[in-house]
UniProtKB/Swiss-Prot annotation:
GN (gene name): ai4
Source species of the chain: Dictyostelium discoideum (Social amoeba)
EC number: 3.1.-.-
Cleaved signal peptide residues: none
Keyword Hydrolase: yes
Taxonomic classification: Eukaryota, Amoebozoa, Evosea, Eumycetozoa, Dictyostelia
UniProt similarity note: Belongs to the LAGLIDADG endonuclease family.
GO biological process: intron homing
Principal location listed in the UniProt entry: mitochondrion
GO molecular function: endonuclease activity
A Pfam entry, by short name: LAGLIDADG_2
Localization terms from the record: Mitochondrion
Protein name: Intron-encoded endonuclease ai4
Length: 159
């Protein structure tokens, strides 16, 4: 479990993670999903990262910084956080970004990692997600799986 990694490395409290159930509806199906939460520490040494990507508590993209820092490990973490396997490819939730930012991120994924991606409009007006196509899954898995916690392999469609 991710908690064990964080706890072993001194990134969180010793309090046992709280388990709760979330019911999600898709079409006519309602499924229960187990979720866990735990408290991580705040490290002042990481404050510069926060200041780089947040202004007045609002996330901002510094596109050149993203280009510089997005590597295989960062992509793995992005997918563990905001990615979801669709049965064929992976959808990355980018609905907090403008269309211009989403277009930049899509092109970055294509150029830097040689992934085939599309931009999809989601159910929220003027919001988009990035879809990594089925054709890119084998390559994507090969470059990010080494950086993923095994409990997150389901985000790649791996059981």
């Amino acid at each position: 479990m991710i908690y064990e990694f964080f706890n072993k490395n001194g990134y969180c409290t010793n309090n046992i993670p709280r388990k709760y159930i979330v019911k999600l509806k898709h079409n006519d199906d309602v499924k229960d999903f187990e979720r866990y939460e735990f408290v991580t520490y705040t490290f002042r040494s990481f404050k510069y990262i926060y200041e780089m990507f947040y202004k007045k508590q609002k996330k901002v993209l510094h596109l050149e910084k993203i280009k510089e820092y997005l590597d295989e490990r960062a992509l793995a973490h992005w997918i563990m956080d905001d990615g979801g396997y669709t049965g064929a490819g992976i959808r990355i939730a980018t609905n907090a970004f403008t269309l211009k930012e989403v277009m930049f991120l899509k092109e970055l994924l294509e150029d830097k990692f040689k992934l085939k991606c599309t931009i999809q409009e989601i159910y929220i007006k003027d919001k988009w997600s990035i879809y990594i196509t089925k054709d890119s899954m084998t390559h994507l898995i090969s470059i990010i799986k080494p950086y993923m916690h095994p409990s997150m392999y389901y985000k790649l469609g791996i059981k």
